[in-house]
Amino acid sequence: MDNVSMDMLYIAVAVMIGLAAIGAAVGIGILGSKFLEGVARQPDLTSLLRTQFFVVMGLVDAIPMIAVGLGLYMLFAVI
C-alpha cells in the first residue's frame, strides 16, 4: 500500500474510535442525568432504576468497544 492510502487508513481509524468515544460519553451523560431525575422523582424505585441504569449503560458502552475492535482490526489486519 502506498503512503496516501495508509494515511487515510490511520485517519479513518482515528475518526472511528474518536466518534465512538464521544458518542458514548454523550449517551452515558444523558442516561445519568435521566437516572438522577428519576431517582429525584421516585426515591422508592432507586434499586429498580439503578439496575436498569447499569444494564442500559452496558449496552451504550458496548458500541464503542465494538468500534475500537473494528478500528484496531482495520489498522493491523489491512496492512
UniProtKB/Swiss-Prot annotation:
Gene3D superfamilies to which the protein is assigned, alphabetical: F1F0 ATP synthase subunit C
Source species, domain of life: Bacteria
Keyword Transport: yes
Annotated site residue numbers, Reversibly protonated during proton transport: D61
GO MF entries: lipid binding; proton-transporting ATP synthase activity, rotational mechanism
Pfam families reported in the protein's UniProt record: ATP-synt_C
Membrane-topology descriptor: Multi-pass membrane protein
InterPro entries referenced in this protein's UniProt entry, alphabetically: ATP_synth_csu_bac/chlpt, ATP_synth_F0_csu, ATP_synth_F0_csu_DDCD_BS, ATP_synth_F0_csu_sf, ATPase_proteolipid_c-like_dom, F/V-ATP_Csub_sf
Chain ranges passing through the membrane: 11-31, 59-79
Main location: membrane
UniProt key word Ion transport: yes
Subcellular location field: Cell membrane
Subunit structure: F-type ATPases have 2 components, F(1) - the catalytic core - and F(0) - the membrane proton channel. F(1) has five subunits: alpha(3), beta(3), gamma(1), delta(1), epsilon(1). F(0) has three main subunits: a(1), b(2) and c(10-14). The alpha and beta chains form an alternating ring which encloses part of the gamma chain. F(1) is attached to F(0) by a central stalk formed by the gamma and epsilon chains, while a peripheral stalk is formed by the delta and b chains.
Function: F(1)F(0) ATP synthase produces ATP from ADP in the presence of a proton or sodium gradient. F-type ATPases consist of two structural domains, F(1) containing the extramembraneous catalytic core and F(0) containing the membrane proton channel, linked together by a central stalk and a peripheral stalk. During catalysis, ATP synthesis in the catalytic domain of F(1) is coupled via a rotary mechanism of the central stalk subunits to proton translocation.
Protein name in UniProt: ATP synthase subunit c
Species of origin: Buchnera aphidicola subsp. Baizongia pistaciae (strain Bp)
